[in-house]
């Protein structure tokens, strides 16, 4: 027998004559090499080359005593793992590490079976050799004959030892199971004719019929069914042979199984039926077959997901179309309350969404606590968003509280999702459809300011977004829009030009009196850690944060252009006094402010912040309009 030596990059067989490769090495070197190889093999899995070589190498079965067999693989039993260098060297050095023994020859029984030598087997039996004794893995010569497809040898062993026909290996594999796995139909038929039990399963509870379906061997299935194999036997996952054949879209095998008594409504451990498998995997022909044979088109798994839901989730358009044509209910929700339309919108499949829209109940959608608009906006599926808006879905439908809590910012509108994604087109679509920009806990305008997207800001303001938005969970004495824009003076000026209220920035609670210590970094960005109402943050407090304080002078300078006579608190004066070039800002704040400036503020206040954009329509000289719009600061 040749011994296989595993190397890092490849496998090669080394026979008696090839041990000369290591003849120049001392015993200590050989042992060291073997130990290193053994340690390396333990710390790494098989390389792609090794896996490929293993799949292409002819099966080398286990032998009778004293040779051993490696555990078999359920997919192609029994695969024998190649010997590593450590085992090869240790086989060369027997019990005495310093004595070399010759490798044993192949067992004569196995040799006779592999070569199909029936006469040799008969002679051994006549000579009294016991061929019904298993090896350490429970394999009999009968198993070997079935595995190698040696029909003549198989019949000899059947006749000599009829009581071993259903004997199993340690992996619970019978000769019939092995013959089926190897697709030796003549051996399969011979065993069944000799009385082999067709429903004995392996350790995974897979029967020969199941393996025949797995290998799409219709003739093997036909033979097994003819010999009364149980078509409804379940493996350890609860799958039947019909589940397996449906997953492979094997209509011929499905026909044989159903004719042999297979139940089309059989369920696995997750309550999944064959029709559900067909819908899930997109096997349209299998689906048609099962529907024709009476399978429930509205079948649901243990999580309440329907076949239509799974087909929509996996974007099998033809399957969805067929299910709907057969009357599938589009209003069956899964355990999370989601309908097929929800998952189709989430996936962004426009065609499936169009098929589901006419058959989906708006009441069921509202009851789910989430609109398909939310899912389409969250995933930037603009085409689906357009289809849903065209179907007149409620653009202001909020997320249910339990769903909103899944997001840290407690978002609730589809518009918020679009703004968070910085999707200007989707934002415009939703606003044109009537989306309210002031419904969320945190205004979408604040998100747009954080992104610095002027186009989105303008869209939101044009459609009524509150430019003086506040954050309820982080209360401030001044608009949060100013807080978010402080690090970009041009953005701050843009917001002030559009009517943002700067007066609260100078209405300090402490005035000229002493202020509390400057806040720690992150003080204004952390949520409250207890149940007490958070304290209201003053403008001067926020301006004292390290990441903002270096811009204190320019920020105050911009804000002074949009307020009248105000009083700087002691903290703001400290900031201005900290840099001598900012002295002019302190002078600018001293009352009284210029009359023209006060008149400008009065006119803008009379117009109102929501009509500031109409300043150009006033019957006034162009120079005055430019002054009102802060286009001429002189």
From Swiss-Prot:
Any Pfam family the entry gives: SOCS_box
Induction pattern: Repressed by FST in 6-month-old mice but no effect is seen in 24-month-old mice. Expression is increased 4-fold 3 days after denervation, becomes suppressed by approximately 75% 7 days after denervation, and eventually resolves to baseline by 28 days after denervation. Induced transcriptionally by AHR.
GO molecular function: cullin family protein binding; ubiquitin protein ligase activity
Effect of gene knockout: Embryonic lethality with death occurring in utero around 9.5 dpc. Mice have placental defects, that subsequently result in failure to form a normal cardiac septum, leading to embryo mortality in utero. Embryos display defects in vascular development and hematopoiesis and increased protein levels of Flna in the heart. Conditional knockout in the whole heart and in the first heart field results in pericardial edema and embryonic lethality.
Tissue spec. comment: Highest expression in muscle, heart and spleen. Highly expressed in cells of the first and second heart fields in the developing embryonic heart. At 9.5 dpc, robust expression predominantly in the left and right ventricles (RV) and to a lower extent in inflow and outflow tracts. At 10.5 and 11.5 dpc, expression is restricted to the myocardium with no expression observed in the endocardium.
ANK repeats: 104-133, 137-167, 171-200, 204-233, 237-266, 270-299, 303-332, 336-365, 368-397, 410-439, 440-469, 476-504
GO BP annotations listed: actin cytoskeleton organization; cardiac muscle cell development; cardiac muscle cell differentiation; dendritic cell migration; heart looping; intracellular signal transduction; myoblast differentiation; podosome assembly
Keyword annotations: ANK repeat, Cytoplasm, Cytoskeleton, Phosphoprotein, Repeat, Ubl conjugation, Ubl conjugation pathway
Gene3D superfamilies according to UniProt: Ankyrin repeat-containing domain, SOCS box
Phosphoserine modified-residue sites: 371
Record-linked PROSITE patterns: ANK_REP_REGION, ANK_REPEAT, SOCS, UIM
Pathway connected to this protein: Protein modification; protein ubiquitination
Alphabetized InterPro entries for the sequence: Ankyrin_rpt, Ankyrin_rpt-contain_sf, SOCS_box, SOCS_box-like_dom_sf, UIM_dom
Spans traversing the lipid bilayer: none
Residue ranges occupied by any UIM domain in the UniProt entry: 26-45
Annotated SOCS box domain residues: 580-634
Residue segments, region Disordered: 36-82
Localization per Swiss-Prot or TrEMBL: Cytoplasm, Cytoskeleton, Stress fiber
This protein's record includes keyword Phosphoprotein: yes
One GO cellular component term: stress fiber
Free-text domain note: The SOCS box domain mediates the interaction with the Elongin BC complex, an adapter module in different E3 ubiquitin-protein ligase complexes.
Protein function: Substrate-recognition component of a SCF-like ECS (Elongin-Cullin-SOCS-box protein) E3 ubiquitin-protein ligase complex which mediates the ubiquitination and subsequent proteasomal degradation of target proteins. Mediates Notch-induced ubiquitination and degradation of substrates including TCF3/E2A and JAK2. Required during embryonic heart development for complete heart looping. Required for cardiomyocyte differentiation. Specifically promotes the ubiquitination of SMAD9 and targets it for proteasomal degradation, leading to avoid excessive accumulation of SMAD9.
Subunit note: Component of a probable ECS E3 ubiquitin-protein ligase complex which contains CUL5, either RBX1 or RNF7/RBX2, Elongin BC complex (ELOB and ELOC) and ASB2. Interacts with SKP2. Through its interaction with SKP2, likely to bridge the formation of dimeric E3-ubiquitin-protein ligase complexes composed of an ECS complex and an SCF(SKP2) complex. Interacts with JAK2; the interaction targets JAK2 for Notch-mediated proteasomal degradation. Interacts with TCF3/E2A; the interaction is mediated by SKP2 and targets TCF3 for Notch-mediated proteasomal degradation.
Family as reported in the entry's similarity comment: Belongs to the ankyrin SOCS box (ASB) family.
PANTHER family documented for this protein: ANKYRIN REPEAT CONTAINING, ANKYRIN REPEAT DOMAIN-CONTAINING PROTEIN 16
The protein, known as: Ankyrin repeat and SOCS box protein 2
The species this protein was found in: Mus musculus
Organism phylogeny: Eukaryota, Metazoa, Chordata, Craniata, Vertebrata
């Amino acid at each position: 027998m040749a011994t296989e030596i595993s190397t890092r990059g490849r496998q090669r067989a080394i026979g008696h004559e090839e041990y000369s490769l290591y003849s120049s090495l001392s015993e200590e070197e050989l042992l060291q090499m073997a130990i290193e190889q053994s340690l390396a093999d333990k710390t790494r899995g098989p390389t792609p080359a090794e896996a490929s070589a293993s799949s292409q190498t002819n099966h080398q079965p286990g032998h009778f005593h004293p040779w051993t067999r490696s555990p078999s693989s359920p997919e192609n039993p029994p695969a024998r793992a190649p010997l590593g260098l450590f085992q090869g060297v240790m086989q060369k050095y027997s019990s005495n590490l310093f004595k070399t023994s010759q490798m044993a020859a192949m067992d004569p029984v196995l040799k006779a079976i592999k070569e199909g030598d029936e006469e040799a087997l008969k002679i051994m039996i006549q000579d009294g050799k016991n061929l019904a004794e298993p090896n350490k893995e429970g394999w009999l010569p009968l198993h070997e004959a079935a595995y190698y497809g040696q029909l003549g040898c198989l019949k000899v062993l059947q006749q000599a030892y009829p009581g071993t026909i259903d004997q199993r290996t340690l992996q619970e594999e019978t000769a019939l199971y092995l013959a089926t796995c190897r697709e030796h139909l003549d051996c399969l038929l011979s065993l069944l004719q000799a009385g082999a039990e067709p429903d004995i399963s392996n350790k995974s509870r897979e029967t020969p019929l199941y393996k025949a379906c797995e290998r799409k061997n219709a003739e093997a299935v036909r033979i097994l069914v003819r010999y009364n194999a149980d078509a409804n036997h379940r493996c350890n996952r609860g799958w039947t042979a019909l589940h397996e054949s449906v997953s492979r879209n094997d209509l011929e095998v499905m026909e044989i199984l159903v004719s042999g008594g297979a139940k089309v409504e059989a369920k696995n451990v997750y309550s999944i039926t064959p029709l559900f498998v067909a819908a899930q995997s997109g096997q349209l022909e299998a689906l048609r077959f099962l529907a024709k044979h009476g399978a429930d088109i509205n079948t649901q798994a243990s999580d309440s997901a329907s076949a239509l839901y799974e087909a929509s989730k996996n974007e099998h358009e033809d399957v969805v179309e067929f299910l709907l044509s057969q009357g599938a209910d589009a209003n069956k929700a899964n355990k999370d309350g989601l309908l097929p339309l929800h998952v189709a919108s989430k996936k962004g499949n426009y065609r499936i969404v169009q098929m589901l829209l006419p058959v989906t109940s708006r009441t069921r959608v509202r009851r789910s606590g989430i609109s398909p608009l939310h899912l389409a906006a969250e995933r930037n599926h603009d085409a689906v968003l357009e289809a849903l808006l065209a179907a007149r879905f409620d653009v202001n439908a909020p997320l249910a509280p339990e769903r909103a809590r899944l997001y840290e910012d407690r978002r609730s509108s589809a518009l918020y999702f679009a703004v968070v994604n910085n999707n200007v087109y989707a934002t415009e679509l939703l606003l044109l459809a009537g989306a309210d920009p002031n419904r969320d806990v945190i205004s979408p305008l604040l998100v747009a300011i954080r992104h610095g997207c002027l186009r989105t800001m303008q869209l939101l303001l044009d459609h009524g977004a509150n430019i003086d938005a506040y954050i309820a969970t982080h209360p401030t004495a001044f608009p949060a829009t100013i807080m978010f824009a402080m690090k970009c003076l041009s953005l701050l000026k843009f917001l002030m030009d559009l009517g943002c209220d700067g007066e609260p920035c100078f209405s300090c609670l402490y005035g000229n009196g002493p202020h509390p210590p400057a806040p720690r970094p992150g003080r204004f960005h952390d949520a409250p850690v207890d149940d007490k109402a958070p304290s209201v943050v003053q403008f001067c407090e926020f301006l004292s944060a390290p990441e903002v304080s270096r811009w204190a002078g320019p920020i105050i300078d911009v804000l002074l252009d949009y307020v009248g006579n105000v009083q700087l608190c002691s903290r703001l004066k400290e900031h201005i006094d900290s840099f001598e070039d900012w002295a002019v800002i302190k002078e600018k704040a001293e009352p009284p402010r210029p009359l023209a400036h006060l008149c400008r503020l009065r006119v803008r206040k009379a117009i109102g912040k929501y009509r500031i954009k109409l300043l150009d329509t006033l019957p006034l000289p162009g120079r005055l309009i430019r002054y009102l719009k802060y286009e001429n600061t002189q």
